[in-house]
Amino acid sequence: MTSANKSNIPALLALAVSAFAIGTTEFISVGLLPLIADDLDIPVTTAGLTVSLYALGVTFGAPILTSLTSSMSRKTLLLWIMFIFIAGNTMAATASSIGILLAARVISAFSHGVFMSIGSTIAADIVPEDKRASAISIMFTGLTVATVTGVPFGTFIGQQFGWRFAFMVIIAVGIIAFITNGILVPSKLRKGTKTTMRDQLKLVTNSRLLLLFVITALGYGGTFVVFTYLSPLLQEVTGFKAGTVAVILLGYGIAIAIGNMIGGKLSNRNPIAALFYMFIVQAIVLFVLTFTAPYQAAGLITILCMGLLAFMNVPGLQVYVVMLAERFVPSAVDVASAMNIAAFNAGIALGSYLGGVITDSIGLIHTAWIGGLMVVGAVILTGWSRLMEKRDRQEA
């Protein structure tokens, strides 16, 4: 592991640029659902599959493809990832039916899963151990900046020029990310380690890692019960106009970026303890939103608080999975990171699916407290994991 110095920063920034491109394409559908539904003449909940199937593509693609590409040069793999990303979004921009659009989203999702897994391990590997969460948070800043600017700007572009043009802009960002990776990411990165079936079996049967994957899915996915349908909630429940929603999404994204950086700082030394308290506050905010959503001022404040907490847990979850993998399955750290990325997206898929079911059955307002229940599950399991961590320290 190299020491932290200024030469690490360009590589981290290159990863952040790629994360920005990928983050924009992941979440842009949230703001474009009504436009996609109108253009393809489908229900908005069917258009919502562009979010949930993307998440499923990451869920299944991340561990499988990361394992298959484990012996490749990290830089070569990064460039191939961005090439596939560009191809998938080109297919989406030219899709003539929902079937083609969903297939394009899954292709893009495959690049997402591999990038986020190896990106996290590269970021963690090029800094000292006590700076790992901060390094990962720098990489994930690209993802949060995508939510700050990419999603609201993409929503605005879609409203002005059509949803297809929004995807064309993403293609341009992907090309920039490809060039940035080629120039700034050093060739002399830690080589991938070929993971054996025995290592993978050991990984998927390790109770501590499996527990963390469930925590990730519940804690991260709870917010997406609400977030996937945030645009219609803001319009139909809170009473904001469509043009105002893009501005609110910008504020939501700024809150996410701030929360991500705070989460990285809080998680540097004791990530599991930090996660426990983050999830408690996150659950409370989601429950409160159930009561404040019908009121514009109170609802807006609560939604911004939800944004502050939405990604705050990401650096801690990723650094903790690396810590556990190095302890229990050191030859499969990349695959463990990929499986946690899969868990993030399993949470998104579950959350967005539940959001659609709830919206169709009992109404948008109920997405908040049901999302809160998911996060309560993460609180309970994080508390359990925290107790086991304390026991390990006592036995050491």
UniProtKB/Swiss-Prot annotation:
The keyword Glycoprotein does not apply. GO terms for molecular function: transmembrane transporter activity. Signal peptide: none annotated. Its main location: membrane. CDD domains: MFS_NepI_like (cd17324). Belongs to the major facilitator superfamily. This is Uncharacterized MFS-type transporter YtbD. It comes from Bacillus subtilis (strain 168).
